[in-house]
Curated annotation (Swiss-Prot):
UniProt-annotated location(s): Cell membrane
Extracellular side: 1-9, 67-69, 123-131, 187-189
Protein name per the record: Bidirectional sugar transporter SWEET6b
GN (gene name): SWEET6B
Keyword Plastid applies: no
Annotated family: Belongs to the SWEET sugar transporter family.
Example of a GO biological process term: carbohydrate transport
Protein backbone atom coordinates (compact mmCIF):
# COMPACT_ATOMS: atom_id res chain seq x y z
CA UNK A 1 0.00 0.00 0.00
CA UNK A 2 1.28 3.47 -0.89
CA UNK A 3 2.19 5.59 2.10
CA UNK A 4 0.71 9.12 2.42
CA UNK A 5 4.16 10.67 1.93
CA UNK A 6 4.75 8.68 -1.26
CA UNK A 7 1.33 9.65 -2.61
CA UNK A 8 2.02 13.28 -1.71
CA UNK A 9 5.31 13.19 -3.59
CA UNK A 10 3.68 11.70 -6.69
CA UNK A 11 0.93 14.34 -6.67
CA UNK A 12 3.52 17.07 -6.08
CA UNK A 13 5.64 15.92 -9.02
CA UNK A 14 2.57 15.94 -11.27
CA UNK A 15 1.80 19.42 -9.95
CA UNK A 16 5.34 20.53 -10.80
CA UNK A 17 4.91 19.34 -14.39
CA UNK A 18 1.54 21.08 -14.83
CA UNK A 19 2.72 24.31 -13.20
CA UNK A 20 5.84 24.34 -15.36
CA UNK A 21 3.62 24.22 -18.42
CA UNK A 22 1.64 27.17 -17.10
CA UNK A 23 4.82 29.15 -16.46
CA UNK A 24 5.69 28.63 -20.13
CA UNK A 25 2.29 29.83 -21.40
CA UNK A 26 3.53 33.40 -22.11
CA UNK A 27 6.31 32.14 -24.42
CA UNK A 28 4.39 33.16 -27.61
CA UNK A 29 4.09 36.68 -26.21
CA UNK A 30 7.83 36.97 -25.67
CA UNK A 31 8.62 35.32 -28.97
CA UNK A 32 6.60 38.09 -30.59
CA UNK A 33 8.43 40.73 -28.53
CA UNK A 34 11.82 39.33 -29.56
CA UNK A 35 10.85 39.17 -33.24
CA UNK A 36 9.56 42.75 -33.26
CA UNK A 37 12.14 44.05 -30.76
CA UNK A 38 9.32 46.00 -29.13
CA UNK A 39 7.11 45.34 -26.10
CA UNK A 40 4.28 47.24 -27.81
CA UNK A 41 1.39 47.69 -25.34
CA UNK A 42 2.30 44.73 -23.12
CA UNK A 43 3.00 45.45 -19.47
CA UNK A 44 5.51 43.87 -17.10
CA UNK A 45 3.13 44.04 -14.12
CA UNK A 46 1.87 40.42 -14.28
CA UNK A 47 5.40 39.04 -14.45
CA UNK A 48 6.62 41.26 -11.62
CA UNK A 49 3.72 40.10 -9.45
CA UNK A 50 4.33 36.45 -10.30
CA UNK A 51 8.02 36.91 -9.45
CA UNK A 52 7.10 38.16 -5.96
CA UNK A 53 4.64 35.31 -5.53
CA UNK A 54 7.33 32.76 -6.45
CA UNK A 55 9.85 34.34 -4.05
CA UNK A 56 7.38 34.07 -1.18
CA UNK A 57 6.60 30.41 -1.93
CA UNK A 58 10.28 29.50 -2.22
CA UNK A 59 10.89 31.04 1.20
CA UNK A 60 7.82 29.25 2.59
CA UNK A 61 9.00 25.86 1.34
CA UNK A 62 12.59 25.89 2.62
CA UNK A 63 13.27 23.56 5.59
CA UNK A 64 13.91 26.32 8.14
CA UNK A 65 10.40 27.69 7.53
CA UNK A 66 8.23 24.72 6.52
CA UNK A 67 9.94 21.31 6.40
CA UNK A 68 9.05 18.61 3.86
CA UNK A 69 7.96 21.06 1.17
CA UNK A 70 10.76 20.62 -1.34
CA UNK A 71 8.33 20.25 -4.26
CA UNK A 72 6.91 23.69 -3.47
CA UNK A 73 10.46 25.04 -3.61
CA UNK A 74 11.35 23.33 -6.89
CA UNK A 75 8.43 24.60 -8.96
CA UNK A 76 8.63 28.12 -7.60
CA UNK A 77 12.40 28.13 -8.01
CA UNK A 78 11.81 27.25 -11.66
CA UNK A 79 9.18 29.98 -11.73
CA UNK A 80 11.75 32.52 -10.53
CA UNK A 81 14.07 31.60 -13.40
CA UNK A 82 11.29 31.68 -15.99
CA UNK A 83 9.81 34.97 -14.78
CA UNK A 84 13.29 36.47 -14.49
CA UNK A 85 13.92 35.53 -18.13
CA UNK A 86 10.63 37.13 -19.19
CA UNK A 87 11.49 40.32 -17.31
CA UNK A 88 14.98 40.44 -18.83
CA UNK A 89 13.50 40.23 -22.32
CA UNK A 90 10.90 42.83 -21.42
CA UNK A 91 13.61 45.12 -20.03
CA UNK A 92 15.75 44.64 -23.14
CA UNK A 93 13.06 45.86 -25.52
CA UNK A 94 11.34 48.47 -23.35
CA UNK A 95 11.71 52.26 -23.59
CA UNK A 96 13.59 53.95 -20.75
CA UNK A 97 10.42 54.99 -18.93
CA UNK A 98 9.22 51.39 -18.65
CA UNK A 99 12.70 50.22 -17.69
CA UNK A 100 12.91 52.68 -14.80
CA UNK A 101 9.48 51.63 -13.57
CA UNK A 102 10.47 47.96 -13.73
CA UNK A 103 13.64 48.60 -11.75
CA UNK A 104 11.69 50.57 -9.15
CA UNK A 105 9.14 47.78 -8.67
CA UNK A 106 11.88 45.14 -8.55
CA UNK A 107 13.69 47.19 -5.94
CA UNK A 108 10.56 47.43 -3.79
CA UNK A 109 9.97 43.68 -4.11
CA UNK A 110 13.54 42.83 -3.11
CA UNK A 111 13.43 45.18 -0.12
CA UNK A 112 10.09 43.67 0.90
CA UNK A 113 11.45 40.12 0.65
CA UNK A 114 14.56 41.06 2.61
CA UNK A 115 12.37 42.55 5.34
CA UNK A 116 10.17 39.42 5.41
CA UNK A 117 13.16 37.06 5.57
CA UNK A 118 14.95 38.98 8.32
CA UNK A 119 11.74 39.60 10.25
CA UNK A 120 10.68 35.95 10.17
CA UNK A 121 14.09 34.45 10.95
CA UNK A 122 14.88 36.89 13.75
CA UNK A 123 11.48 37.12 15.44
CA UNK A 124 9.97 33.65 14.94
CA UNK A 125 11.95 30.74 16.34
CA UNK A 126 9.70 27.76 15.58
CA UNK A 127 8.59 26.17 12.33
CA UNK A 128 4.97 26.72 13.29
CA UNK A 129 5.36 30.48 13.74
CA UNK A 130 7.51 30.90 10.64
CA UNK A 131 5.11 28.85 8.53
CA UNK A 132 2.17 30.89 9.78
CA UNK A 133 3.72 34.29 9.01
CA UNK A 134 5.04 33.40 5.56
CA UNK A 135 1.99 31.25 4.79
CA UNK A 136 -0.40 34.13 5.48
CA UNK A 137 1.59 36.34 3.10
CA UNK A 138 1.52 33.61 0.44
CA UNK A 139 -2.23 33.15 0.84
CA UNK A 140 -2.83 36.92 0.67
CA UNK A 141 -0.81 37.56 -2.49
CA UNK A 142 -1.74 34.24 -4.11
CA UNK A 143 -5.46 34.76 -3.53
CA UNK A 144 -5.33 38.26 -5.01
CA UNK A 145 -3.90 36.79 -8.19
CA UNK A 146 -6.77 34.32 -8.46
CA UNK A 147 -9.36 37.10 -8.58
CA UNK A 148 -7.87 38.43 -11.83
CA UNK A 149 -9.83 36.05 -14.10
CA UNK A 150 -13.09 37.58 -12.85
CA UNK A 151 -12.66 40.32 -15.45
CA UNK A 152 -12.28 37.76 -18.23
CA UNK A 153 -15.20 35.66 -16.95
CA UNK A 154 -17.37 38.77 -16.82
CA UNK A 155 -16.42 39.52 -20.41
CA UNK A 156 -17.37 35.97 -21.45
CA UNK A 157 -20.81 36.34 -19.87
CA UNK A 158 -21.33 39.81 -21.34
CA UNK A 159 -20.27 38.92 -24.89
CA UNK A 160 -21.47 35.29 -24.77
CA UNK A 161 -18.12 34.41 -26.30
CA UNK A 162 -15.20 32.33 -25.00
CA UNK A 163 -12.81 33.85 -27.53
CA UNK A 164 -10.53 35.17 -24.78
CA UNK A 165 -10.74 32.08 -22.56
CA UNK A 166 -9.25 29.06 -24.36
CA UNK A 167 -10.51 25.67 -23.25
CA UNK A 168 -7.10 24.03 -22.91
CA UNK A 169 -5.70 26.71 -20.60
CA UNK A 170 -8.86 26.68 -18.49
CA UNK A 171 -8.66 22.88 -18.20
CA UNK A 172 -4.97 22.91 -17.23
CA UNK A 173 -5.70 25.64 -14.69
CA UNK A 174 -8.40 23.52 -13.12
CA UNK A 175 -6.21 20.40 -13.05
CA UNK A 176 -3.35 22.38 -11.55
CA UNK A 177 -5.54 23.73 -8.76
CA UNK A 178 -6.97 20.28 -8.05
CA UNK A 179 -3.52 18.69 -8.05
CA UNK A 180 -1.97 21.13 -5.58
CA UNK A 181 -5.07 21.10 -3.38
CA UNK A 182 -4.78 17.31 -3.18
CA UNK A 183 -1.08 17.68 -2.38
CA UNK A 184 -1.91 20.05 0.47
CA UNK A 185 -4.67 17.82 1.87
CA UNK A 186 -2.59 14.63 2.04
CA UNK A 187 -0.44 16.21 4.73
CA UNK A 188 -2.75 19.07 5.61
CA UNK A 189 -1.32 22.49 4.82
CA UNK A 190 -3.91 25.24 5.08
CA UNK A 191 -1.65 27.81 3.41
CA UNK A 192 -1.26 25.76 0.23
CA UNK A 193 -4.89 24.58 0.32
CA UNK A 194 -6.56 28.01 0.30
CA UNK A 195 -5.05 29.61 -2.83
CA UNK A 196 -5.03 26.37 -4.80
CA UNK A 197 -8.57 25.55 -3.73
CA UNK A 198 -9.54 28.94 -5.15
CA UNK A 199 -7.61 28.06 -8.30
CA UNK A 200 -9.56 24.83 -8.69
CA UNK A 201 -12.88 26.62 -8.13
CA UNK A 202 -12.14 29.39 -10.63
CA UNK A 203 -10.85 26.82 -13.11
CA UNK A 204 -14.10 24.86 -12.76
CA UNK A 205 -16.14 28.03 -13.28
CA UNK A 206 -14.16 28.79 -16.43
CA UNK A 207 -14.90 25.30 -17.76
CA UNK A 208 -18.60 25.70 -16.99
CA UNK A 209 -18.67 29.06 -18.77
CA UNK A 210 -16.88 27.51 -21.71
CA UNK A 211 -19.52 24.78 -21.93
CA UNK A 212 -22.30 27.38 -21.74
CA UNK A 213 -20.95 29.84 -24.32
CA UNK A 214 -18.85 27.75 -26.69
CA UNK A 215 -21.62 27.44 -29.28
CA UNK A 216 -22.38 31.17 -29.24
CA UNK A 217 -18.74 32.17 -29.84
CA UNK A 218 -18.20 33.68 -33.31
CA UNK A 219 -15.39 32.24 -35.40
CA UNK A 220 -12.23 34.29 -35.03
CA UNK A 221 -10.71 36.04 -37.96
CA UNK A 222 -7.06 35.52 -38.82
CA UNK A 223 -6.31 39.07 -37.61
CA UNK A 224 -7.80 38.31 -34.23
CA UNK A 225 -5.72 35.16 -33.91
CA UNK A 226 -2.56 37.07 -34.74
CA UNK A 227 -2.94 39.43 -31.80
CA UNK A 228 -4.15 36.90 -29.25
CA UNK A 229 -1.44 36.29 -26.67
CA UNK A 230 -1.27 34.34 -23.45
CA UNK A 231 0.15 36.31 -20.56
CA UNK A 232 0.75 35.85 -16.87
CA UNK A 233 -1.89 36.98 -14.39
CA UNK A 234 -1.14 38.82 -11.32
CA UNK A 235 -3.33 41.71 -11.86
CA UNK A 236 -5.93 42.44 -14.52
CA UNK A 237 -5.02 40.33 -17.48
CA UNK A 238 -4.02 36.69 -17.47
CA UNK A 239 -1.73 34.61 -15.22
CA UNK A 240 0.17 31.73 -13.84
CA UNK A 241 1.13 31.54 -10.23
CA UNK A 242 2.33 28.54 -8.44
CA UNK A 243 2.57 27.21 -5.08
CA UNK A 244 2.04 25.76 -7.54
CA UNK A 245 -1.52 26.99 -8.06
CA UNK A 246 -2.35 28.65 -11.32
CA UNK A 247 -5.06 30.46 -13.10
CA UNK A 248 -4.49 31.19 -16.74
CA UNK A 249 -6.55 33.16 -19.18
CA UNK A 250 -5.80 34.86 -22.45
CA UNK A 251 -6.04 38.54 -23.11
CA UNK A 252 -5.64 40.52 -26.27
CA UNK A 253 -3.30 43.47 -26.49
CA UNK A 254 -3.79 45.78 -29.42
Amino acid sequence: MISPDAARNVVGIIGNVISFGLFLSPVPTFWRICKRKDVEQFKADPYLATLLNCMLWVFYGIPIVHPNSILVVTINGIGLIVEGTYLFIFFLYSPNKKRLRMLAVLGVELVFMLAVILGVLLSAHTHKKRSMIVGILCVFFGSIMYFSPLTIMGKVIKTKSVEYMPFFLSLVCFLNGVCWTAYALIRFDIYVTIPNGLGAIFGAIQLILYACYYRTTPKKTKAAKDVEMPSVISGPGAAATASGGSVVSVTVER
